[in-house]
């Protein structure tokens, strides 16, 4: 996959207008042979994706569950251009998720991308997020926003991913589903939903377990999810959401190139240190929506939660003899919460419609961070994988207060102007409580602020063709984890680290063709003060600011469903992400550690392709085939190690039967159909060259579900 897409881009942009003119305009009665009418969530309300002046995709929850295990977002988001989701097969570290290259540096969790679940941020104020609490079994839809307008969501919003829980409808419905597959993998889910008068409800619970394809990669995850909606007499709406997740996962770690070549399923270091992670999280959110009058509305959201994490790492006892070392066991306890108040109004400007949004968001995080040695006994004869002496104790706090506003003005019959601004201010404070000997008081504070403007212009060329251009500025602060360690073995937080600032421009086209939707976008993002790895030794990574980076890209998407229920999907991404300035990692500079200008940013594939064909009637037999290809991915900044590109295929078939009040569904699926051996993801800049996380070989999944409507 090395061909330049430039010629294809020119043909596409020249051909879309002619193709759109050749198709009859869709009518409200059209129905069969067209994609169903859908909307996506924006600050100003629900809008059809075709009318959004930016790159946004929606994946329906039923589609995410169709013929799949229903555990990871990587199973079902392949049809979203610009989104790279890699399953590490390591449930101690979450998925590797990036949007247009933002988030690619993350070695665990999600950074650089803003995540929301039912409107509640799954990204904390410092920019660190996770997807493990998303219950695919109860998801109504997932929406992915890319491009300049994602900056309106504040810090670390190189892209935005939102998941929404379904609302209960009709008479009570009780459902059970189960799926099992290779390597001791299984999932069970139970759900109750419905509505009665002004109240709708959904309660769900699921348990997932796997023995793991690799050695020392077993995991268990329990999720409970609830949603309660109450329509008040005055037309207002109150929604309560609850979510809880617990994860117990072994950490198989990465492999060196030699280890991957000889024994990709082994995890020798992980078994020696018994590396593992335990996570417990519970959160609650309350949303109040009020219609003030015919033109104005008010939305008030408040949420709170707690997350506890304990992680055992593979840091040698010898490295922990430095009196400033924080140990090999991480013990985190976090309390978080926030408020978002938003006012919307439908006004007039020069006798033209003007939609206005103004709001204020406040988010806070309080963290107790402790570090312990991961051994007992002597350095020469240690008992590994147990909690030892305390080596770190601190209380950290992060909070942000962000006012924002957005306006959409229909300035002419075919022209729409949209603009917005957000003032994002993020405050960090650390109170050191481990002051022992040479380990001095490292308390401190930092404050990062930036004004983030965005603007777009949309032209409705025909009823079936829309063109747009957008520009915007975003920024990304370092996370608490990136601030946690300083180079040279010094203790305390790295408050010298600065936020990165990016400027983005995008040109796009959307065309409705033969009942399908074709989207195309060209974009460029220039970033200064990119946050990159400085050192990665002794089990600890430190970070620094590099110079400038540039991301040039092209995305193409196609969604179509015929009248006889054949569904096709295509997503292609070309992304050239490079460092524009040279820097050294680690510092000081030497020939071996100089990152040259022009080097590719690691963790990002230059090209990716997803294609699927499925027969999906509303009842009876259904089947499909999927193909996914990914180009070579660099594993480090100096570009001396990489994971080769690959292409894999999957087949699935199932049967859906509806009988009176019952509904039954069964399926079988084979992934990696041709048993391709490849690297599923890389651990960017891993200090011991253990970059590679192998993907599993050919594997199968079978599942069954049954539901009864009372």
What residue spans do the PLM features occupy?
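Conserved C-terminal beta-signal and adjacent last beta-strands/turns
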Residues: 231, 243, 469, 505, ...
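Membrane-embedded beta-barrel scaffold of Gram-negative outer-membrane proteins
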Residues: 287-289, 297-315, 460, 466-472, ...
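N-terminal periplasmic accessory domains that precede
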Residues: 73, 96-100, 113-117, 130-132, ...
């Amino acid at each position: 996959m090395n061909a330049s897409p430039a010629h294809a881009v020119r043909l596409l942009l020249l051909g879309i207008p002619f193709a759109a003119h050749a198709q009859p305009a869709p009518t409200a009665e059209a129905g069969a042979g067209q994609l169903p009418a859908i909307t996506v969530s924006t600050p100003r309300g629900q809008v059809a994706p075709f009318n959004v002046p930016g790159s946004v995709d929606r994946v329906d929850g039923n589609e995410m569950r169709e013929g799949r295990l229903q555990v990871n977002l990587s199973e079902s988001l392949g049809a979203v251009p610009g989104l790279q989701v890699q399953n590490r097969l390591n449930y101690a570290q979450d998925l590797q998720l990036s949007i247009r290259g933002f988030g690619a540096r993350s070695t665990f969790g999600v950074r650089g991308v803003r995540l929301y679940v039912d409107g509640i941020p799954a990204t904390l104020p410092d920019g660190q997020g996770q997807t493990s609490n998303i219950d695919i079994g109860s998801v109504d839809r997932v929406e992915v926003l890319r491009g300049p307008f994602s900056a309106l969501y504040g810090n670390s919003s190189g892209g935005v991913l939102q998941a929404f829980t379904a609302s209960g409808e009709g008479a009570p419905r009780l459902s059970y589903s189960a799926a099992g597959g290779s390597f001791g993998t299984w999932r069970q889910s139970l759900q109750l939903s419905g509505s009665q008068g002004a109240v709708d409800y959904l309660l769900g619970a699921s348990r997932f377990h796997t023995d793991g394809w690799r050695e020392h990669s077993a995991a268990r995850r329990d999720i409970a999810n609830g949603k309660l909606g109450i329509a008040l007499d005055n037309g207002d709406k109150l929604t309560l959401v609850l979510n809880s997740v617990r994860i117990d996962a072994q950490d198989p770690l990465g492999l060196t190139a030699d280890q991957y070549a000889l024994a990709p399923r082994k995890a020798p270091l992980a078994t020696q240190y018994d590396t593992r992670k335990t996570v417990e999280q519970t959160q609650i959110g309350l949303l109040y929506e009020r219609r003030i009058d015919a033109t104005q509305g008010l939305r008030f959201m408040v949420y709170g939660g707690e997350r506890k994490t304990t992680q055992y790492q593979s840091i040698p006892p010898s490295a922990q003899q430095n009196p400033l070392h924080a140990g090999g066991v991480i013990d985190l306890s976090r309390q978080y919460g926030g408020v978002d108040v938003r006012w919307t109004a439908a006004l007039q400007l020069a006798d033209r419609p003007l939609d206005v949004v103004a709001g204020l968001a406040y988010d806070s995080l309080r963290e107790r961070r402790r570090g312990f040695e991961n051994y007992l006994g002597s350095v020469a004869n240690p008992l590994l994988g147990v909690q030892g002496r305390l080596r770190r104790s601190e209380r950290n706090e992060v909070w942000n207060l962000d006012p924002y506003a957005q306006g959409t003005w229909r300035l002419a019959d075919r022209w729409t102007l949209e603009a917005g601004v957000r003032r994002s201010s993020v405050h960090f404070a650390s109170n050191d409580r481990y002051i022992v000997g040479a380990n001095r008081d490292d308390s401190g504070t930092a404050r990062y602020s930036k004004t983030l403007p965005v603007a777009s212009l949309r032209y409705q060329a025909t009823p079936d063709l829309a063109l747009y251009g957008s520009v915007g500025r975003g920024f990304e602060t370092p996370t608490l984890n990136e601030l946690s360690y300083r180079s040279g073995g010094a203790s305390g937080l790295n408050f010298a680290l600065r936020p990165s600032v990016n400027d983005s421009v995008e040109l796009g086209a959307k065309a409705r063709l033969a009942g399908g939707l074709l989207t195309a976008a060209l974009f460029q993002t220039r970033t200064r003060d990119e946050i990159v790895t400085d050192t990665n030794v002794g089990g600890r990574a430190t970070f620094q600011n590099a110079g400038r980076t540039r991301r040039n890209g092209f995305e193409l998407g196609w969604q179509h469903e015929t009248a006889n229920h054949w569904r096709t999907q295509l997503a292609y991404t070309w992304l050239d992400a490079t460092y524009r300035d040279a820097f050294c990692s680690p510092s000081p500079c030497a020939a071996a550690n100089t990152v040259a200008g022009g080097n590719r940013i690691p963790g990002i594939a230059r090209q990716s392709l997803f294609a699927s064909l499925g027969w999906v009637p509303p009842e009876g037999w259904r089947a499909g085939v999927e193909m996914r290809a990914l180009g070579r991915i660099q594993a480090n900044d100096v570009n001396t190690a990489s994971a080769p590109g690959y292409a894999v295929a999957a087949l699935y078939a199932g049967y859906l039967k509806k009988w009176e009040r019952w509904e039954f569904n069964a399926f079988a699926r084979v992934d990696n159909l041709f048993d391709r051996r490849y690297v599923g993801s890389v651990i960017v800049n891993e200090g011991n060259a253990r970059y590679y996380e192998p993907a599993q070989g050919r594997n199968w999944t079978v599942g069954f579900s049954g539901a009864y409507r009372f």
